[in-house]
């Protein structure tokens, strides 16, 4: 069953990217990238991880815009993916990109300090 949840998650990720970029006209929803979709084993709940280009204020307004469009997004997913019941969608920020950038910055600083000491 886990394999099916993964396949549904990947299909939802692809469709959500298209829906968010082409169908949602809300100005609050700007540069959004769907980084991952985790679907529960019973296919009832889908957690969508997104990254947003911008500051904290833009991220918050984007999340509010997506929350407002959640019903529309869910109906679009239901039309595009044939499931008995369309999963309940929740949006969360993907913090892993920020963590990765922070680690990369720290590694560059350590590398520069190591070259100075030589």
Curated annotation (Swiss-Prot):
GO MF, one annotated term: ribosomal small subunit binding
Keyword Heme: no
Keywords: Cytoplasm, Ribosome biogenesis
A single Gene Ontology CC term: cytosol
InterPro entries referenced in this protein's UniProt entry, alphabetically: KH_dom-like_a/b (IPR015946), RbfA (IPR000238), RbfA_dom_sf (IPR023799), Ribosome-bd_factorA_CS (IPR020053)
Superkingdom, taxonomy of origin: Bacteria
Record's subcellular location: Cytoplasm
Keyword Ligase appears in the UniProt entry: no
Record-linked Pfam families: RBFA (PF02033)
GO BP annotations, alphabetical order: maturation of SSU-rRNA
Subunit structure: Monomer. Binds 30S ribosomal subunits, but not 50S ribosomal subunits or 70S ribosomes.
Family statement drawn from the similarity comment of this UniProt entry: Belongs to the RbfA family.
Function: One of several proteins that assist in the late maturation steps of the functional core of the 30S ribosomal subunit. Associates with free 30S ribosomal subunits (but not with 30S subunits that are part of 70S ribosomes or polysomes). Required for efficient processing of 16S rRNA. May interact with the 5'-terminal helix region of 16S rRNA.
NCBIfam families: rbfA
HAMAP family: RbfA
UniProt-recorded name of the protein: Ribosome-binding factor A
Organism: Bacillus cereus (strain AH187)
